[in-house]
Amino acid sequence: MTRVRRGYIARRRRTKIRLFTSTFRGAHSRLTRTTTQQKMRALVSSHRDRCRQKRDFRRLWITRINAVTRENRVSYSYSRLMHDLYKRQLLLNRKILAQIAISNRNCIYMISNEIIK
């Protein structure tokens, strides 16, 4: 069989992977086989955690709103507050409500008074 000259294709692929894993520690940034495995693992983790991040922030916002409503007797619970908001068609999302609850609690009182009327 004749010798096949492959050029720089494999080397280019390996250097691309090494650039991705250059900040990893130990053999994970040096050895080709482990770098490919760690690259795949890193990409899987980043995809999973992008989806998880949305869940975590939503939970945080709900916890903050619930804490303020229970602490200052704005409403009996978070779920009742949200139900009354939708009933009165005051469409505020949870992120904005959580920011209002932390920074300006008087505004939460005003919103709850609007709901009660």
Swiss-Prot record:
SUPFAM superfamilies: Ribosomal protein L20. Keywords: Chloroplast, Plastid, Ribonucleoprotein, Ribosomal protein, RNA-binding, rRNA-binding. GO terms for molecular function: rRNA binding; structural constituent of ribosome. GO terms for cellular component: chloroplast; ribonucleoprotein complex; ribosome. GO terms for biological process: ribosomal large subunit assembly; translation. It is found in: Plastid, Chloroplast. Disulfide bonds: none annotated. InterPro entries: Ribosomal_bL20, RIBOSOMAL_L20_CS, Ribosomal_protein_bL20_C. Binds directly to 23S ribosomal RNA and is necessary for the in vitro assembly process of the 50S ribosomal subunit. It is not involved in the protein synthesizing functions of that subunit. Belongs to the bacterial ribosomal protein bL20 family. This is Large ribosomal subunit protein bL20c. It comes from Drimys granadensis. The gene is rpl20.
